[in-house]
Structure formats: C-alpha cells, structure tokens
Amino acid sequence: YVALMIEALADGGVKVGLDRLTAMTLAAQTVLGSAKLLIETGAHPGQLKDMVTSPGGTAIAGIAALEEGGVRRTLISAVERATLRSRELGRGTKDDKKA
C-alpha cells in the first residue's frame, strides 16, 4: 500500500511541476521521515499530524483533500479486503488460483 501512496505523491509532485526524480525522492523521504518520527517518539499519528499542521497552511490543505477523497475509509477497506482474501487463501478456496 505504501509504495502505491509514494507513487501517487510523486505523481502529484510531477503534476505541479517537479521533475520525476525530485518528486519521487521527496515523496519517499516524506513517508520515511513520518514513519521514523512515529517509531522514535511513540506518538499517535494524530499527534504528529497536529505537530505539522498550521491554520491555513499547506499540510492542512493537503490533509483536507485526502479526507474529502475518502483516503482513510479506502485504506481501512483495503486492509479488510486483504484480510478476507488471506483467510480465503488459508482455507484453500477455489478462487485461490486467481491470486
């Protein structure tokens, strides 16, 4: 899932004028930095979000767009579907040949 998110972030960077390498590097570094900060501090992701947003700022504008697009709901659904599929494969259903 994270690779898809990094790719989409990089595509967004290219869309607003960055070259592909810069966009990919910035996207990957953003994800890496956030993950490291969460692991090192033990902070809740919501706390990290609050730390990096300011009223009317760029981060909150991007977060609002993600929420409007249903990213939270979509990620939860992806985990649920993957879990269901894993259980199906564990039972050896006839659909496992399509995986």
Model-flagged regions — what are they?
Residues 24-99:
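NAD(P)-dependent Rossmann-like dehydrogenase/reductase catalytic/cofactor-binding core
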Residues 1-25:
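Anionic-ligand binding region
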